[in-house]
UniProtKB/Swiss-Prot annotation:
Record protein name field: Leucine--tRNA ligase
Keyword Phosphoprotein among record annotations: no
Gene Ontology terms describing biological process: leucyl-tRNA aminoacylation
One GO cellular component, as annotated: cytosol
Similarity comment: family membership: Belongs to the class-I aminoacyl-tRNA synthetase family.
GN (gene name): leuS
Classification lineage: Bacteria, Pseudomonadati, Pseudomonadota, Gammaproteobacteria, Enterobacterales
Motif ('KMSKS' region): 619-623
Listed EC numbers: 6.1.1.4
Amino acid sequence: MQEQYRPEEIESKVQLHWDEKRTFEVTEDESKEKYYCLSMLPYPSGRLHMGHVRNYTIGDVVARYQRMLGKNVLQPIGWDAFGLPAEGAAVKNNTAPAPWTYDNIAYMKNQLKTLGFGYDWSREIATCTPEYYRWEQKFFTELYKKGLVYKKTSAVNWCPNDQTVLANEQVIDGCCWRCDTKVERKEIPQWFIKITAYADELLRDLDKLDHWPDTVKTMQRNWIGRSEGVEITFDVKGYDNTLTVYTTRPDTFMGATYLAVAAGHPLAQKAAANNAELAAFIDECRNTKVAEAEMATMEKKGVDTGYKAIHPLTGEEIPVWAANFVLMEYGTGAVMAVPGHDQRDYEFASKYGLTIKPVILAADGSEPDLSEQALTEKGVLFNSGEFDGLAFEAAFNAIADKLAEKGVGERKVNYRLRDWGVSRQRYWGAPIPMVTLEDGTVLPTPEDQLPVILPEDVVMDGITSPIKADPEWAKTTVNGMPALRETDTFDTFMESSWYYARYTCPQYQEGMLDSKAANYWLPVDIYIGGIEHAIMHLLYFRFFHKLMRDAGMVTSDEPAKQLLCQGMVLADAFYYVGENGERNWVSPVDAIVERDEKGRIVKAKDAAGHELVYTGMSKMSKSKNNGIDPQVMVERYGADTVRLFMMFASPADMTLEWQESGVEGANRFIKRVWKLVYEHTAKGSVAALNVDALSEDQKALRRDVHKTIAKVTDDIGRRQTFNTAIAAIMELMNKLAKAPQEGEQDRALLQEALQAVVRMLNPFTPHVCFTLWQELGGEGDIDNAPWPVADEQAMVENTTLVVVQVNGKVRGKITVAVDATEEQVRERAGQEHLVAKYLDGVTVRKVIYVPGKLLNLVVG
């Protein structure tokens, strides 16, 4: 064994061994308990960032630990390879998206191997290959035949710069999340999957997810948004159709003073023909912000359509307004407004001088004061005719029944969740497998024509999708009839909704999944990724699993038992102000800093002498130029050091502050372990440990070893507090480094302790542990070694701490044998000088003894 720790030599050698031995390749084995550990697959952007490294290190630690418990562990990896960034890069680099993507995959794969992640590379998938997306296309055609897929014209968020549709969540401050261009509203035909058909089950089954974070479950509950209410129909004077609204507060119905419709509603469109102000307003609404957060804060605007609706219970005429806060695609595109008891309706009514009618009493039974805001709390009705005096539930039922009796109302369960629009007007995605015949008939692509292959040898102009620009690509025949292919591609969330299942059988050619393999491995035991995916990917992931279950491919109801959302990685951020007032962000690597006595940054400059503004720690990002390249850190310190720091610096679900001083500390610790093993093994062979021959000090040290094993096992396995597990190992190492190594049993005990330490550290620092295990004479590769088991007998304390009181006041603490008698404890207490001075010259009148815990001497 060499004296110096040289990670660059060790790590490449160990990684080559894993590759040659195919150490982490697994197959189904009914004789072993399975464990499926999965980190969210990366987008091949070109280089790994520290967020990736944290995610995959957590996964690898869990997988290696479970493997050491003797389980059959699957830990696969792949590439979420379709998506818009590839198109931008292709235009910029004058290439096609495919070669750019495949080059990135090759580079990032090498980075993952350099970090020592124990993946089963035989299962690697790239979602942009026809071998993968052919099954997704086939499944889509089957969903279409089941009636779960449909096409309709829909108002969408349209980014004129990227020429694509954006989901509501991708609209930030009215602008595109990628390029910051102002988003427009546009009507285009789109394909949808009926996720709403599964809304109830998606909501209900959240209760089965005991090991998912409550925050994620709450976000999904709110996103699905189940509500119980009443759908009410209004007649409209001079308009051929009725208006239908949905309300969860029918108790306030007698206070409805106007209706509001979306700018795109047929009633508004008809009224605009003779109303220039309304026509201009409708035009303005085409660019309205549509993300819910934006709609909540934007200025509420509207125009009177001139139409009057008839209140079904009072017969009163109430105005119908077109308003920018009503959207056609939400509900019926019309809402009932009760300004006395809804703040949004109140603000709108106040602005335009509309009637505000209170119908709910304040909590103290008085009429509400509506001079400044609406009363939104539930309460007792007044001003409501026959319903006066009813509280919320009774009023809800009475008014719902009355409306039903008159044929103008119906109880209904509604959801905020909308069907999943899967069409994207981009090139680099899986083609949607649908065709249109010359007579307009729409059909799924026949199975013998699947996959519909995306041509990869294309020229990108940055404006039009190559498959839209090439009329020949769209031409095909179906059943001998000419047809045109769909030129939209799938939303990339389609690929990431089922990849976890394909990992169980990536080479299977008979269908989307080999049910036998899928049902052996699924559900995933732990899924690791960022909380930013809570309501998009993680909802579609659950939805797709249920679709595959109903297609007979899997038997479980949910795709993953546990979800672990890792925290973000933060780093220092610095900038200087340029000549034109712009901020120029400087990498923390290039910042020369001065710190105060507490280590806080007080001054900073860069190599060019610019005075830098320090903005504190923020998420590593390209925009702030504060990302730290993992490659540089691995080359400087080794992969094991980077991994250890990542797991030690913070609890896995909390933010991690990148500090190079912490990385240096992790490196020093590994060197200390190396040094102790080197010194120990240099002394030659070790005798067998004889537990019965150990001295009290040796027993105490062995007790510490086994208590550490118990704690680390609990911290990694049950609590998943990886940082405290590492802290416990570090604490034990301090004791081992100070322990005597002269006697035969000293060395035998150290041998047992070091073999335990190396195995406990193995999930975190696998390269150095692989090497040290061999040096310590461990049997076989450490990758196949069992996790150390705490010896219950060794952990039994043979002494205990007894608190000594005199007249009820604590005067000292004494260590006694566990089996000491009361007499022995009293004698030992009398020898303790802190206690003895209170007993001098007094008589002990009474003794209260709680064995092994407390001795109270009552004196007088």
